[in-house]
Amino acid sequence: MEVAALVALTLLLGALVILVALAVVRRKEEIKEESEQAAESSAEASAAKGPTSKKQKQEKQRSRKDKPAQHSFSHPLLAASLKGHSGNVTCLDFSSNGKYLASCADDRTVRIWSTKDFLEREHKCLRANVELDHATLVRFSPDSRAFITWLSNGDAIRIFKMIKKDDGTFSFKAASEDFPQKHKAAIVNIGIAETGKFIMSASTDTTILIWDLKGEVLASINTNQMTNSYAATSPCGRFVASCGFTPDVKVWEVCFGKGGEFREVTRAFDLKGHSAGVHAFAFSNDSHRMVTVSKDGTWKLWNTNVEYKKQQDPYLLGTVPCSSSDGSRVALSPDGRVVAISDGCNVAMFDATTGNLEEELRGVHSEEITDIRFDINSRFLVCSGDKAIRVFHNAPGYRASIRDMQDMLKKAQNEAMKQRLQQQIREAQSALDTVLAAPTE
């Protein structure tokens, strides 16, 4: 009985093995047939290259169209559109020697542009990579041989040295260590004093920190403005200022001894006159003028060339209505002749003396403008908002300088002075005519 059962089991196993073998052979034949059919279909498609190929091209074209179109913009004063970033540009800064423009974006790079290429067809730039992070703010050092950045994720300052190569370009080397993390709220701005003696950083929680160049905190300032919306160092290197929820701008002097050692931070003066919080402010190149833009719908121009230690207050020179919003930025041309204010995607340019609206630049960027600046010679206005940087001719500046020289000509009594002014007026008018006649970017 047991022998019969064993024989039956053996036969059953043998039958199963045969069935499995047949199934494997059958599957191999099916796979071979499928591969041959696929090869034939591919050959036919390659030979025909007809409807299928066209359909594929149409699908590719359709996928390209589905991508958001790049924002197009043109204007008679547009000198150039600097394109190189693959992410949105968040900050701009000109070097003090006027040769370079730095830009940072959320694409983990800082780009260095040559200002002499602004009017050229091609705009080359040098790229500094921000490892494992991206910079939201960038500022040149006074000697134009380094720049500092604020790291978005690291919440710290990182210094980059610019090392000049034999071909005239630069390589970039980050400092071995970042500054320590000290701020407890979002950063609104950073800056380096033109004297090279200190670095400033300011956050929304009313804190301003004064650092030495090695990353040690020299002083902490509480602005008592409920929130800080903006802060900056003055071009002269003596002052730091802030604005925020309160309707004033507060200015402090950072004091150093004769030997260069830090002494103290003292309150210098306030700009009082707005009826609502101040969005932003800017200095002229000599720090003798300041401009403020407020939620009250006005901008104000101030004479800040005062002896504040003798309790002399700044003089209000003018109040002008304007359109602004929480993200508005303001720039004052280095010569103090033109005020530029951003509002959303638009820019308005005013004559600083008369308050007249000279130019309205609408739809400059596809997103809210993040920064706006004049170059050190007051020839160009640059702004950022999306992936591009717009460069505009400062036509209002040319007009204002011509007007100023014409006023001087009326008062001139010396013949040599008159001839010199007449020549300068002709040159300025010729430059303006060239700008207005130039083809747009």
Regions found by a protein language model. Name each.
Residues 96-97, 142-143, 194-195, 235-236, ...:
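Residue-level detector of Asp-centered blade-edge/turn motifs that repeat once per structural unit
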Residues 104-107, 150-154, 202-205, 243-246, ...:
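Conserved strand-to-loop turn within each blade of WD40 beta-propeller repeats
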Residues 2-38, 42, 367-368, 375-380, ...:
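Terminal intrinsically disordered, low-complexity extensions flanking WD-repeat/beta-propeller proteins
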Residues 87-93, 132-140, 184-192, 226-233, ...:
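Canonical WD40 repeat/beta-propeller blade segments in eukaryotic WD-repeat proteins
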Residues 48-74:
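Blade/loop signatures of beta-propeller domains
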Residues 67-77, 112-127, 152-177, 184, ...:
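Per-blade loop-tip surfaces of WD-repeat and WD-like beta-propellers in eukaryotic adaptors/scaffolds
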Residues 82-101, 105-106:
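Beta-strand-rich domains and repeat architectures in extracellular enzymes and scaffolds
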